[in-house]
C-alpha cells in the first residue's frame, strides 16, 4: 500500500505552526510497513485541495489528511473530500449530540458554525473525537481510501492510534512489527559500512538507517501472519547488529541518550556535577530533564571566564597560561575541580571554541575538549567539528553524555 500525507492549513504554509503531524503519521505508517511516498502542505483553498487529491490518488492507494475540519468558513477539507468522491454531506445526529455535549463542558452553546462539524459524506466511517469538536472520518471508494483527521496533534494522535491503526491493520492482512536501535558515537555512513552485508541482503525483516544530529537510528521491520512470528524474525537480525556495533548502541525504542545516562547514575547511586564553558549549561539541562535525577545530580556550574575557572573550579592559573582555556589539561582540571568542590563521584566538563569567532590556527573553531573525573580517575576526549555555533554546542553535549556512558559500562 502506498500513502500520501496531506496537511491542510494556511498557518502551516506561513510557518506559524510546525507540522509535527506528518512526522508522527509517517513513523506510525512505517511501523505498519505502509510506504509513504509524499508529504504535501496546502492552504485552506478548495480548488487547490481538489487538485492535490486528484494528483495524490494517481499513484497512491491511501491519502491521509490533517486539518481543515474546524467550524469556520475556511475549514474546507470535508467539503473538498466529499466533492472529490462525489458524495453528499449529511447531518450525523450522534456526532451533533457529542459536539453539543463537549461544548456544554465549556459553558458554550451550539452554533450554526459548530453544527457544520457534524456533517459527513453519506458513505463513510465516522471517527469520534473525545478531545475536540471535529470528528474525523474514513471514506473508501473505487479502490481509493481517504482518512480525514483533525489538525491539533492532541486530537489527531489518539484518533489515529485508536481508530486508524486498527482499520489499516485489517487491510494489510498481516502483522508488521518494528524495533528501533539507537546509535551514537559513529556516523550514519560508518554504520552503513559496518552492517553493509545486512543492508545489501535484506528481505524480511528490512533494516533502514536514519540520521539525525548526533546519532543514527536503525529500524528493523518484519512482516508475518502473527505478532509473535514478526517479533521472532527481528531477534536474529537485532542480535547480529548488536554484535557488530557493540557499545555504540545506547538504547532502543524511544529511549533518549540522557535517559540512559541518568538511569545508570541513579541505579548505581553515582553523584555527578557539571562544569561547562562552551556549552553554557546545556549538558546540565539535558541531565536534569530526567525525573529522579535530583538524587544524584548535585550541581552545575557555568564557568565561562578564566577567572571563574580559577575561583570556582580551582583550575591552576599556570595551566591556563601555558595551555589556554581550550585544552585537555584545563578540561581535566575543570572536571576534577567541580567533583571535589561539589563532593561528587563524577565531574564532567566541556571547554572549546564554538564560534563563529574566536578561532586561531592552533585552536580552530569546532575544537572541543570533554573532561571526565570518576572516583579519582580522569580521562579526556578531543573533538573537532564544523558547523554553526548551536550545532557545535549541541553535538558537544551529545558526545559528552556518550563519553560518560561508555566510561560507566
Swiss-Prot record:
SMART domains: MoCF_biosynth. HAMAP family: CinA_B (MF_00226_B). Belongs to the CinA family. This is Putative competence-damage inducible protein. It comes from Clostridium botulinum (strain Loch Maree / Type A3).
